[in-house]
């Protein structure tokens, strides 16, 4: 593990040396990873996880990014759902919506953040400024931040690091 300083706060970061892909597959084999949002980060993270053998679903509202998800192989009613339904079905809820989107959808999905679930962020405006946004996770769920290290253009391939 590595100690990293994030804006004056030292965090212990689990790297791929301590937590291999094989170990991740074993630990997460019974989890459903719900990617909420298929805009900037959604396609890369969802595709990376799916291509590496994880159980992934996508939550996206109808529109051009929904159509892109279908074109990318996500199947409506099977692996592609509304944001609310994906939040309900997922055990790991990945908030990859825009900052404004996270704030707007929060009242609709917070009821699905039940004990034992994990809320996952890749950017933290809404949760860090929760006194202004109203995004306050329940005390009985885990909250994590996943930082991406991009190895290819447009997030075609990503290496994930988890800050816990």
Briefly describe each language-model feature range.
Residues 70-74, 87, 109-113, 135-137:
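Short, surface-exposed basic-aromatic patches at helix termini and helix-loop junctions that form
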Residues 83-129:
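Rossmann-fold NAD(P) dinucleotide-binding segment
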Residues 75-84:
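Glycine-rich, highly charged phosphate/nucleotide-binding loops
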Residues 31, 53, 89-91, 116, ...:
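Short, well-ordered alpha-helix to beta-strand connector turns
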Residues 120-164:
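Rossmann-fold dinucleotide-binding core
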Residues 55, 78-79, 142:
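Conserved beta-strand segments of alpha/beta enzyme cores
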């Amino acid at each position: 593990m590595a100690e990293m300083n994030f804006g004056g706060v030292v965090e212990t970061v689990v790297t791929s040396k301590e937590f291999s892909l094989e170990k991740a597959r074993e630990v997460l084999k019974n989890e459903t990873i719900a990617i909420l949002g298929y805009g900037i980060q959604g396609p890369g993270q969802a595709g990376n996880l799916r291509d590496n053998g994880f159980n992934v679903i996508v939550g996206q509202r109808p529109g051009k990014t929904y159509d892109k998800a279908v074109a990318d192989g996500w199947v409506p009613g099977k692996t592609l759902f509304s944001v609310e339904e994906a939040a309900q079905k997922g055990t790991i809820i990945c908030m990859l919506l825009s900052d404004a989107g996270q704030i707007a959808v929060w009242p609709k999905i917070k009821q699905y953040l039940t004990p034992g679930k994990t809320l996952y962020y890749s950017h933290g405006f809404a949760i860090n400024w929760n006194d202004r946004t109203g995004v306050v996770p329940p005390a009985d769920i885990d909250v994590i931040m996943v930082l991406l290290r991009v190895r290819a253009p447009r997030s075609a391939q990503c290496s994930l690091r988890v800050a816990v």
